[in-house]
């Protein structure tokens, strides 16, 4: 009797598992089915915060259909907006909303598919992991230039920043340092990845990255008592936040339209969440 009960139970569990995995496969296939039978290329450039999501989405699409080729480059938000506006790429990513002037000049259509924060980071060996907003402004202006003034070692502070084409810099400049001056002694890096690498290799460095890019190689710095985490951004406690945009020149069509629609699909939004961002749906 026990053997019969075990067999029946096993069959029921097996059937449930089969139905579950079939449902998951159907949902995933449904999002990618739109690319079946398509051919062509999609060129993407711009914001570097977007790249992990872009790469994962592109990989899944190209695995589904090898007749589609998707190229992804960084360069920063300003580059993405300019290149899509000039027809050099199909999709230009930006970590800030394009300005009214850019929208008008390039006839841009904007698609915000996730929310991100910009967090201040230091080397994990640095014991200074909390600052006031006023202290941060003074650090980046060069007014405070030694860690000992903040309770750290008697070592010069090495400031790292991004160039003016960066959407990450734009948000940091506006929301973290109140459009204040950035010292001309600052070291420039070209991407979120390069910023992490620089800070992880400099015990006395300080910079800022997309919250979605923060990992064990750098240490987040609390500002006015609030640590830059995904949850704090989501709850509105951490105010240095921004949208992640994919922009097109005019209404998107063809593969560009399908790629953007994929970003808004349940699967695309899950990719965004998996990469450390807040889905909008």
Cite the ranges covered by each PLM segment.
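N-terminal hydrophobic signal/anchor transmembrane helix of membrane proteins
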Residues: 11-14, 126-128
């Amino acid at each position: 009797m026990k053997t019969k009960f075990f067999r029946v139970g096993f069959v029921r569990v097996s059937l449930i598992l089969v139905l579950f995995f079939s449902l998951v496969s159907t949902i995933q296939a449904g999002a990618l089915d739109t690319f079946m039978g398509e051919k062509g290329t999609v060129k993407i450039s711009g914001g570097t915060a977007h790249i992990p999501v872009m790469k994962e989405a592109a990989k899944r699409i190209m695995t589904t259909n090898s007749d589609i080729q998707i190229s992804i480059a960084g360069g920063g938000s300003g580059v993405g907006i300019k290149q899509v506006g000039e027809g050099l790429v199909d999709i230009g990513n930006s970590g800030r909303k394009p300005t009214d002037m850019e929208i008008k000049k390039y006839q841009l259509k904007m698609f915000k598919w996730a929310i991100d924060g910009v967090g201040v980071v230091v080397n994990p060996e640095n014991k200074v992991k909390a600052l006031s907003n006023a202290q941060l402004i003074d650090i980046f202006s060069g007014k405070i230039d030694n860690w000992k003034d903040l309770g750290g070692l008697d070592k010069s502070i090495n400031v790292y920043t991004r160039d003016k084409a960066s959407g990450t810099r734009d948000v940091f400049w506006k929301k973290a340092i109140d459009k204040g001056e950035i010292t001309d002694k600052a070291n420039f890096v070209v991407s979120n990845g390069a910023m992490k690498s620089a800070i992880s290799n400099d015990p006395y460095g300080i910079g800022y990255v997309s919250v979605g890019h923060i990992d064990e190689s750098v240490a987040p710095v609390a500002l006015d008592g609030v640590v830059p985490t995904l949850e704090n951004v989501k709850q509105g406690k951490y105010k240095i936040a921004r949208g992640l945009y994919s922009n097109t020149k005019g209404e998107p069509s063809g593969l560009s339209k399908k790629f953007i629609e994929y970003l808004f699909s349940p699967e695309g939004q899950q990719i965004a969440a998996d990469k450390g961002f807040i889905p909008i749906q």
